[in-house]
């Protein structure tokens, strides 16, 4: 399969690595010439500095990965779909539901697939708990607690689009949209939301919150609390999801949902989980579990053999919708 990369920042390095294992990286594009040139040289790809030029000249591409700033995902995805190329869009799908709908419409009109990266779904503990829920082993789920306690220091936001309302969108979009995705994937849609937001440690650096608390009520009656911050001192502390059910309690914990921290389930024990991948490393900070290998394996198997896809655009939209509702329920900072 023939791939292109739109955006050559840090996450693009991860994409390029796995594209090379699943096909051929034909072209890369970034408005910063040096970034495009370095990645192109490493993978013997053509370098472009304008997406329109790339789409005009590269006529035999199968898939393009969109790795540009959040606020540009929609325009870049739509242009690529209209050029007749399947799209794999980094998270978040976009930063408004309207943009997500426009992306899906472009996909349908072009007859090309639109995928959204949802790498946390491939974490071994996450998949184990999803099986528990699908098999009904927890019985009725009563409530949940989602904790996202990470660190993003001032250097992370310097000389960058990160922290901008227009291009970043908010802490839930950039840091924690994968966690919100898991709530929808495991428990369904949200009915009611009430949130409190604040910016304590990043005043003058970012245009939105660095801390938030949200109370959630799901359509199926489950209630839950989301507690998140990027003010954990010096390093990431915790990324965890705890479910309280009729027949059991289970906590996926660690820094990035990478282990089972607690379980007490009637007549069942989660055991012998594979170790999983490490976290994505971005210089001085860490991200979620590095599962882009599984993202690309899933994408290729879907396109070649019609196997089930874990990364549908409609589910990407639902993540953005839930985040929009959290932000709408509180006064933005």
Residue ranges and their predicted role:
Residues 53, 63-66, 112, 219, ...:
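C-terminal helix-rich "cap/oligomerization" subdomain common to oxidoreductases
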Residues 49, 89, 114-116, 226, ...:
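Hydrophobic residues in well-ordered beta-strands that form the structural core
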Residues 15, 45-106:
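Beta-loop-alpha module in the N-terminal Rossmann-like domain of NAD(P)-dependent dehydrogenases
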Residues 174, 180-259, 293-305:
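Contiguous beta-strand/loop segments that form the cofactor/metal-binding neighborhood of enzyme cores
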Residues 1-43:
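N-terminal Rossmann-like dinucleotide-binding module
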Residues 102-119, 139-145:
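Rossmann-fold dehydrogenase core element
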Residues 283-297:
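Active-site loop of classical SDR/Rossmann-like NAD(P)-dependent oxidoreductases
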Residues 120-205, 333:
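Predominantly a Rossmann-like dinucleotide-binding segment in NAD(P)-dependent oxidoreductases
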């Amino acid at each position: 399969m023939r791939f292109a990369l739109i955006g050559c920042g840090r996450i693009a390095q991860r994409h390029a690595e796995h594209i090379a294992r699943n096909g051929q990286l034909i072209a890369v594009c970034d408005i910063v010439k040096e970034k495009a040139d370095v990645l192109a040289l490493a993978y013997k790809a053509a370098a472009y500095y304008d997406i329109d030029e790339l789409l005009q000249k590269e006529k035999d591409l199968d898939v393009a990965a969109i790795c540009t700033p959040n606020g540009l995902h929609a325009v870049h995805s739509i242009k690529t779909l209209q050029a007749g190329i399947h799209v794999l869009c980094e998270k978040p799908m976009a930063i408004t539901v309207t943009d997500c709908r426009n992306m899906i419409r472009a996909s349908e009109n072009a007859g090309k697939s639109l995928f959204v990266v949802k790498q946390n779904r491939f974490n071994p503990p996450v998949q184990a708990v999803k099986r528990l829920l699908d098999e009904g082993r927890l019985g009725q789920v009563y409530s949940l607690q989602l904790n996202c306690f990470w660190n993003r220091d001032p250097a992370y936001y310097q000389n960058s689009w990160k922290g901008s309302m227009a291009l970043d969108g908010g802490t839930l979009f950039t840091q924690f949209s994968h966690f919100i995705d898991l709530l929808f994937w495991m428990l369904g849609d949200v009915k009611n939301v009430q949130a409190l937001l604040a910016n304590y440690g990043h005043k003058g650096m970012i245009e939105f919150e660095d801390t938030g608390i949200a109370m959630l009520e799901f359509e199926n009656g489950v209630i839950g609390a989301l507690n998140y911050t990027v003010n954990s001192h010096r390093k990431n502390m915790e990324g965890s999801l705890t479910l309280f059910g009729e027949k059991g309690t289970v906590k996926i914990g660690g820094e990035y949902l990478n282990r089972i921290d607690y379980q007490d389930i009637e007549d069942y024990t989660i055991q012998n989980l594979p170790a999983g991948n490490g976290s994505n490393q971005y210089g001085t900070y860490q991200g979620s579990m590095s599962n882009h290998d599984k993202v690309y394996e899933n994408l290729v198997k879907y396109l070649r053999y019609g196997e089930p896809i874990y990364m549908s655009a409609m589910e990407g939209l639902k993540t953005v919708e839930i985040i929009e509702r959290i932000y709408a329920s509180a006064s933005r900072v």
